[in-house]
């Protein structure tokens, strides 16, 4: 089993944990349909940046 050579300080623990925070999903509203979707992704209706890009 691995054992540390010396105790890690509260500061070092905090610096390590500073990268553990979760980020929220970047959502955007389509100007034509008003639908909420992920940024840089086509909506379910097939619109991207106000233009129809997928014909169903």
UniProtKB/Swiss-Prot annotation:
Leader sequence residues: none
Highest taxon above the source species: Bacteria
Compositional bias of kind Basic residues: 1-16
Gene Ontology terms for molecular function: structural constituent of ribosome
InterPro entries reported in the protein's UniProt record: Ribosomal_bL32 (IPR002677), Ribosomal_bL32_bact (IPR044957), Ribosomal_zn-bd (IPR011332)
Region described as Disordered: spans on this chain: 1-22
NCBIfam families: rpmF_bact
Name of the protein: Large ribosomal subunit protein bL32
Origin organism lineage: Bacteria, Pseudomonadati, Pseudomonadota, Gammaproteobacteria, Vibrionales
Gene for this chain: rpmF
């Amino acid at each position: 089993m691995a054992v540390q050579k010396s105790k890690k300080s509260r500061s070092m623990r905090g610096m390590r944990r500073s990268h553990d925070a979760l980020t929220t999903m970047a959502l955007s509203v389509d100007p034509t349909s008003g639908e909420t979707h992920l940024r840089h992704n086509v909506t379910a209706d097939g619109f991207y940046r106000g233009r129809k890009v997928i014909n169903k």
